[in-house]
């Protein structure tokens, strides 16, 4: 019996994440790319901009109602923050059964939406057709903090450094290679959206200081954790190993991971466990590709989970 592929549309397909999504959809045996929406690229062939896609589809400039009329089985919204609501409203009205995955921060605090960080929230998925994809920094922070959450004596301090692709394609200081050359650019040093996101998800205050670096892709997250009681390095390492033993996308490593080794890869590396004298303060480092596990790969995990497929279909 032949399984009919599910149709999928991507809104905001010009961006870096949109490009990665197209690659993953092209590799997926059960998905058919039915539309891609981009105002800037409207009329141009997708294959001219993305080597992974070999079909005849062209970019379209679709408003919210036009997207809803397409009646795709799945719609992924890869739009800047604050832009998703009209599309969600139109789909809610026309085809509420459509699976919507939103990559912006717009619905991460909405309890009606499933918050899709599979390694931590998979067990709470209950068939929701509205899924909010976590932030890139927020993914790295939560995966690093979670194994020690019950041992925390105070707010984790998280020093994050991202490649400039995290600043999107709209020109700004934070994605200007000339300004970033030989530079590190701190920004939003308190109350960053991802700081609030992680605090809400984990139920503890978190302190986060983000920076943009000259490399294109990949995040390094260095997390300082104060512990209620002394733990040995072996005990801490065991917590991470046991917590993620069945998670193919999470690799626990001995040395502190390098961002250059994770760029272009779907997973997360966590390691470099270093204790301060007294064993009540530990520093742990995580790396991930902000465009993949921080965005497109995670969206594909959530899509597969929601449709009852192997979570890593098209990913490995």
UniProtKB/Swiss-Prot annotation:
Enzyme active site: 136
Domain of life: Bacteria
One Pfam family here: Semialdhyde_dhC_1
GO CC field: cytoplasm
UniProt cross-references to SMART domains, sorted A to Z: Semialdhyde_dh (SM00859)
Enzyme class, first EC level, given as a word: oxidoreductase
GO biological process assignments: L-arginine biosynthetic process
Coiled coil: none
Functional pathway: Amino-acid biosynthesis; L-arginine biosynthesis; N(2)-acetyl-L-ornithine from L-glutamate: step 3/4
Listed PROSITE patterns: ARGC
Keywords: Amino-acid biosynthesis, Arginine biosynthesis, Cytoplasm, NADP, Oxidoreductase
Location of this chain's protein in the cell: Cytoplasm
SUPFAM superfamilies: Glyceraldehyde-3-phosphate dehydrogenase-like, C-terminal domain, NAD(P)-binding Rossmann-fold domains
Catalyzed reactions per annotation: N-acetyl-L-glutamate 5-semialdehyde + phosphate + NADP(+) = N-acetyl-L-glutamyl 5-phosphate + NADPH + H(+)
Main location: cytoplasm
EC identifiers of the protein: 1.2.1.38
Sample GO molecular function, one term: NAD binding
Family from the record: Belongs to the NAGSA dehydrogenase family. Type 1 subfamily.
NCBIfam families found in the cross-reference section: argC
Protein role: Catalyzes the NADPH-dependent reduction of N-acetyl-5-glutamyl phosphate to yield N-acetyl-L-glutamate 5-semialdehyde.
Name of the molecule in the record: N-acetyl-gamma-glutamyl-phosphate reductase
